[in-house]
Protein backbone atom coordinates (compact mmCIF):
# COMPACT_ATOMS: atom_id res chain seq x y z
CA UNK A 1 0.00 0.00 0.00
CA UNK A 2 0.97 3.64 -0.29
CA UNK A 3 1.21 3.94 3.49
CA UNK A 4 3.61 0.96 3.65
CA UNK A 5 5.79 2.50 0.94
CA UNK A 6 5.94 5.74 2.95
CA UNK A 7 7.04 3.84 6.07
CA UNK A 8 9.73 1.97 4.12
CA UNK A 9 11.02 5.28 2.75
CA UNK A 10 11.09 6.91 6.19
CA UNK A 11 13.06 3.96 7.54
CA UNK A 12 15.60 4.21 4.74
CA UNK A 13 16.09 7.91 5.52
CA UNK A 14 16.27 7.49 9.31
CA UNK A 15 19.39 8.52 11.20
CA UNK A 16 21.40 5.35 11.86
CA UNK A 17 22.71 6.54 15.21
CA UNK A 18 19.17 7.23 16.42
CA UNK A 19 18.01 3.85 15.14
CA UNK A 20 20.80 2.03 16.99
CA UNK A 21 19.92 3.92 20.18
CA UNK A 22 16.25 2.96 19.78
CA UNK A 23 17.21 -0.69 19.24
CA UNK A 24 19.34 -0.71 22.40
CA UNK A 25 16.48 0.85 24.36
CA UNK A 26 14.01 -1.76 23.05
CA UNK A 27 16.30 -4.61 24.11
CA UNK A 28 16.59 -3.20 27.62
CA UNK A 29 12.91 -3.84 28.20
CA UNK A 30 12.35 -7.24 29.87
CA UNK A 31 10.74 -9.92 27.75
CA UNK A 32 10.31 -13.52 28.78
CA UNK A 33 8.94 -16.75 27.36
CA UNK A 34 5.29 -16.15 28.17
CA UNK A 35 3.75 -17.78 25.11
CA UNK A 36 6.27 -20.60 25.02
CA UNK A 37 5.54 -21.49 28.66
CA UNK A 38 1.78 -21.36 28.08
CA UNK A 39 2.13 -23.56 25.03
CA UNK A 40 4.32 -26.12 26.77
CA UNK A 41 1.86 -26.26 29.68
CA UNK A 42 -1.10 -26.88 27.35
CA UNK A 43 0.77 -29.48 25.29
CA UNK A 44 1.94 -31.43 28.34
CA UNK A 45 -1.49 -31.19 30.00
CA UNK A 46 -3.33 -32.48 26.91
CA UNK A 47 -1.03 -35.46 26.47
CA UNK A 48 -0.98 -36.29 30.19
CA UNK A 49 -4.78 -36.11 30.24
CA UNK A 50 -4.86 -39.02 27.79
CA UNK A 51 -2.47 -41.03 29.98
CA UNK A 52 -4.22 -40.24 33.27
CA UNK A 53 -7.68 -40.95 31.85
CA UNK A 54 -6.50 -44.37 30.66
CA UNK A 55 -4.41 -45.15 33.74
CA UNK A 56 -7.18 -44.32 36.22
CA UNK A 57 -9.90 -45.69 33.91
CA UNK A 58 -12.02 -42.55 34.32
CA UNK A 59 -13.14 -42.70 30.67
CA UNK A 60 -13.28 -38.96 30.11
CA UNK A 61 -10.74 -38.89 27.31
CA UNK A 62 -10.22 -42.26 25.64
CA UNK A 63 -7.92 -43.33 22.81
CA UNK A 64 -4.91 -41.38 21.52
CA UNK A 65 -4.26 -38.27 19.45
CA UNK A 66 -4.94 -40.13 16.21
CA UNK A 67 -8.45 -41.14 17.29
CA UNK A 68 -10.19 -40.51 20.60
CA UNK A 69 -13.46 -39.92 22.40
CA UNK A 70 -13.99 -37.00 24.79
CA UNK A 71 -17.05 -37.38 27.08
CA UNK A 72 -18.85 -39.18 24.27
CA UNK A 73 -17.73 -36.98 21.37
CA UNK A 74 -15.64 -38.81 18.78
CA UNK A 75 -12.49 -36.97 17.69
CA UNK A 76 -10.45 -38.23 14.74
CA UNK A 77 -7.25 -36.69 13.45
CA UNK A 78 -7.85 -35.36 9.93
CA UNK A 79 -4.77 -36.96 8.43
CA UNK A 80 -5.54 -40.30 10.10
CA UNK A 81 -9.11 -40.22 8.78
CA UNK A 82 -7.86 -39.48 5.28
CA UNK A 83 -5.40 -42.38 5.50
CA UNK A 84 -8.13 -44.80 6.61
CA UNK A 85 -10.49 -43.76 3.80
CA UNK A 86 -7.73 -44.00 1.21
CA UNK A 87 -6.84 -47.47 2.48
CA UNK A 88 -10.48 -48.63 2.35
CA UNK A 89 -11.08 -46.76 -0.93
CA UNK A 90 -14.44 -45.37 0.11
CA UNK A 91 -15.90 -42.69 2.39
CA UNK A 92 -16.73 -44.00 5.87
CA UNK A 93 -19.67 -42.02 7.27
CA UNK A 94 -18.99 -42.75 10.96
CA UNK A 95 -15.41 -41.59 10.45
CA UNK A 96 -16.61 -38.32 8.96
CA UNK A 97 -18.66 -37.51 12.07
CA UNK A 98 -15.60 -37.56 14.32
CA UNK A 99 -13.55 -35.78 11.70
CA UNK A 100 -15.99 -32.87 11.40
CA UNK A 101 -15.63 -32.03 15.09
CA UNK A 102 -11.85 -31.84 14.78
CA UNK A 103 -12.13 -29.95 11.50
CA UNK A 104 -14.24 -27.20 13.09
CA UNK A 105 -11.91 -26.93 16.11
CA UNK A 106 -8.79 -26.42 14.00
CA UNK A 107 -10.52 -24.21 11.45
CA UNK A 108 -11.24 -21.85 14.35
CA UNK A 109 -7.92 -22.14 16.21
CA UNK A 110 -5.70 -22.33 13.14
CA UNK A 111 -4.77 -25.70 11.67
CA UNK A 112 -1.07 -25.79 12.50
CA UNK A 113 -1.81 -24.68 16.04
CA UNK A 114 -2.16 -28.44 16.55
CA UNK A 115 1.54 -28.86 15.76
CA UNK A 116 2.90 -26.49 18.38
CA UNK A 117 0.21 -26.71 21.07
CA UNK A 118 -0.73 -30.43 21.02
CA UNK A 119 1.75 -32.62 19.09
CA UNK A 120 4.19 -34.37 21.50
CA UNK A 121 6.86 -34.75 18.82
CA UNK A 122 6.93 -30.99 18.35
CA UNK A 123 7.98 -30.55 21.98
CA UNK A 124 10.77 -33.15 21.74
CA UNK A 125 11.95 -31.64 18.45
CA UNK A 126 11.95 -28.19 20.06
CA UNK A 127 14.24 -29.47 22.81
CA UNK A 128 16.39 -31.29 20.25
CA UNK A 129 16.67 -28.02 18.33
CA UNK A 130 18.22 -26.36 21.39
CA UNK A 131 20.87 -29.09 21.48
CA UNK A 132 21.43 -28.72 17.72
CA UNK A 133 21.95 -24.96 18.07
CA UNK A 134 24.37 -25.48 20.97
CA UNK A 135 26.41 -27.97 18.92
CA UNK A 136 26.25 -25.68 15.88
CA UNK A 137 27.72 -22.82 17.92
CA UNK A 138 30.58 -25.16 18.85
CA UNK A 139 30.91 -25.97 15.12
CA UNK A 140 30.32 -29.66 15.85
CA UNK A 141 27.32 -29.90 13.50
CA UNK A 142 25.95 -27.95 10.54
CA UNK A 143 22.36 -27.34 9.49
CA UNK A 144 21.47 -28.80 6.10
CA UNK A 145 18.55 -26.87 4.65
CA UNK A 146 16.22 -28.70 2.30
CA UNK A 147 13.48 -27.67 -0.09
CA UNK A 148 10.22 -27.27 1.83
CA UNK A 149 8.34 -28.59 -1.21
CA UNK A 150 9.55 -32.00 -0.03
CA UNK A 151 6.66 -31.99 2.44
CA UNK A 152 4.14 -31.88 -0.40
CA UNK A 153 6.00 -34.70 -2.14
CA UNK A 154 5.93 -36.81 1.04
CA UNK A 155 2.21 -36.08 1.47
CA UNK A 156 1.54 -37.43 -2.02
CA UNK A 157 3.82 -40.44 -1.51
CA UNK A 158 2.07 -41.43 1.72
CA UNK A 159 -1.37 -40.93 0.15
CA UNK A 160 -0.54 -43.00 -2.95
CA UNK A 161 1.18 -45.72 -0.90
CA UNK A 162 -1.87 -45.98 1.36
CA UNK A 163 -4.29 -46.08 -1.55
CA UNK A 164 -2.23 -48.68 -3.39
CA UNK A 165 -1.46 -50.97 -0.46
CA UNK A 166 -4.70 -50.72 1.50
CA UNK A 167 -2.58 -50.08 4.60
CA UNK A 168 -2.32 -46.85 6.58
CA UNK A 169 1.37 -46.41 5.77
CA UNK A 170 1.96 -43.08 7.46
CA UNK A 171 0.28 -44.09 10.71
CA UNK A 172 2.86 -46.84 11.11
CA UNK A 173 5.73 -44.33 11.22
CA UNK A 174 4.04 -41.16 12.49
CA UNK A 175 6.06 -39.93 15.49
CA UNK A 176 2.96 -38.09 16.70
CA UNK A 177 0.96 -41.31 16.92
CA UNK A 178 3.88 -43.36 18.23
CA UNK A 179 4.60 -40.94 21.08
CA UNK A 180 0.93 -40.50 21.95
CA UNK A 181 0.39 -44.26 22.22
CA UNK A 182 3.66 -44.71 24.14
CA UNK A 183 2.60 -42.13 26.73
CA UNK A 184 -0.77 -43.81 27.20
CA UNK A 185 -0.11 -47.54 26.82
CA UNK A 186 3.62 -47.77 27.49
CA UNK A 187 6.82 -47.67 25.41
CA UNK A 188 7.45 -49.91 22.42
CA UNK A 189 10.12 -50.61 19.83
CA UNK A 190 8.65 -47.89 17.56
CA UNK A 191 10.25 -45.30 19.85
CA UNK A 192 13.58 -46.22 18.23
CA UNK A 193 12.25 -44.61 15.03
CA UNK A 194 11.40 -41.43 16.94
CA UNK A 195 14.88 -41.43 18.48
CA UNK A 196 16.41 -41.81 15.01
CA UNK A 197 14.43 -38.81 13.74
CA UNK A 198 15.55 -36.68 16.67
CA UNK A 199 19.18 -37.73 16.16
CA UNK A 200 18.92 -36.76 12.49
CA UNK A 201 17.58 -33.35 13.48
CA UNK A 202 20.31 -32.81 16.07
CA UNK A 203 23.19 -33.81 13.81
CA UNK A 204 22.11 -33.08 10.24
CA UNK A 205 19.03 -30.91 9.70
CA UNK A 206 17.27 -28.78 12.30
CA UNK A 207 13.54 -29.59 12.65
CA UNK A 208 13.71 -31.71 9.49
CA UNK A 209 10.61 -33.85 10.11
CA UNK A 210 8.24 -30.95 10.80
CA UNK A 211 9.69 -28.72 8.07
CA UNK A 212 10.21 -31.16 5.23
CA UNK A 213 8.34 -34.43 5.77
CA UNK A 214 5.31 -34.43 8.07
CA UNK A 215 2.01 -34.58 6.14
CA UNK A 216 0.03 -33.70 9.27
CA UNK A 217 1.38 -30.16 9.18
CA UNK A 218 0.47 -29.75 5.53
CA UNK A 219 -3.07 -31.04 6.08
CA UNK A 220 -3.69 -28.80 9.07
CA UNK A 221 -2.10 -25.84 7.32
CA UNK A 222 -4.77 -26.06 4.61
CA UNK A 223 -7.50 -26.43 7.24
CA UNK A 224 -6.37 -23.27 9.03
CA UNK A 225 -6.38 -20.94 6.01
CA UNK A 226 -9.55 -19.17 7.15
CA UNK A 227 -8.81 -19.27 10.89
CA UNK A 228 -9.58 -16.03 12.77
CA UNK A 229 -6.66 -16.72 15.16
CA UNK A 230 -3.43 -15.46 13.66
CA UNK A 231 -0.23 -13.58 14.37
CA UNK A 232 -0.20 -10.03 13.06
CA UNK A 233 2.87 -8.04 12.06
CA UNK A 234 2.97 -4.25 12.43
CA UNK A 235 5.53 -2.56 10.20
CA UNK A 236 5.85 0.80 11.99
CA UNK A 237 7.72 -0.35 15.11
CA UNK A 238 9.88 -3.07 13.55
CA UNK A 239 13.68 -2.67 13.44
CA UNK A 240 14.05 -5.65 11.04
CA UNK A 241 16.72 -7.38 13.14
CA UNK A 242 15.42 -10.82 12.18
CA UNK A 243 15.48 -12.44 15.64
CA UNK A 244 11.92 -13.65 15.07
CA UNK A 245 12.95 -15.54 11.92
CA UNK A 246 15.82 -17.22 13.76
CA UNK A 247 13.50 -18.85 16.30
CA UNK A 248 10.68 -19.69 13.86
CA UNK A 249 9.98 -23.28 12.80
CA UNK A 250 8.65 -21.98 9.47
CA UNK A 251 10.68 -18.80 8.81
CA UNK A 252 9.20 -18.37 5.33
CA UNK A 253 5.98 -17.07 6.95
CA UNK A 254 8.04 -14.19 8.35
CA UNK A 255 9.45 -13.02 5.03
CA UNK A 256 7.30 -9.93 5.48
CA UNK A 257 9.52 -8.72 8.36
CA UNK A 258 12.57 -8.45 6.08
CA UNK A 259 13.28 -4.77 5.50
CA UNK A 260 11.37 -3.39 2.53
CA UNK A 261 9.16 -6.45 1.94
CA UNK A 262 5.99 -5.68 3.89
CA UNK A 263 3.18 -4.84 1.47
CA UNK A 264 1.07 -3.15 4.14
CA UNK A 265 1.55 -1.58 7.56
CA UNK A 266 -0.24 -4.56 9.12
CA UNK A 267 0.24 -8.06 7.70
CA UNK A 268 -1.23 -11.37 8.84
CA UNK A 269 1.17 -14.32 8.79
CA UNK A 270 0.32 -17.17 6.41
CA UNK A 271 -1.51 -20.44 7.23
CA UNK A 272 1.75 -22.38 7.63
CA UNK A 273 2.35 -20.41 10.85
CA UNK A 274 2.05 -22.74 13.88
CA UNK A 275 0.99 -19.93 16.26
CA UNK A 276 3.73 -21.11 18.64
CA UNK A 277 4.31 -17.56 19.86
CA UNK A 278 8.11 -17.73 19.84
CA UNK A 279 8.31 -14.72 17.53
CA UNK A 280 5.93 -12.81 19.79
CA UNK A 281 8.11 -13.57 22.82
CA UNK A 282 11.30 -12.67 20.93
CA UNK A 283 10.25 -9.37 19.32
CA UNK A 284 11.59 -6.49 21.47
CA UNK A 285 9.19 -3.91 20.03
CA UNK A 286 5.90 -5.81 20.14
CA UNK A 287 5.61 -5.68 16.35
CA UNK A 288 4.32 -9.27 16.34
CA UNK A 289 1.16 -10.01 18.32
CA UNK A 290 -1.61 -12.58 18.53
CA UNK A 291 -4.83 -11.36 16.97
CA UNK A 292 -8.36 -12.67 16.55
CA UNK A 293 -9.89 -11.42 13.32
CA UNK A 294 -12.97 -9.28 13.88
CA UNK A 295 -12.69 -9.25 17.67
CA UNK A 296 -11.53 -5.62 17.83
CA UNK A 297 -14.68 -4.58 15.97
CA UNK A 298 -16.87 -6.33 18.53
CA UNK A 299 -15.16 -4.80 21.56
Segments the model singles out, each with a brief description of its role:
Residues 1-266, 271-274, 278-299:
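Non-ligating segments of multi-cofactor redox enzymes
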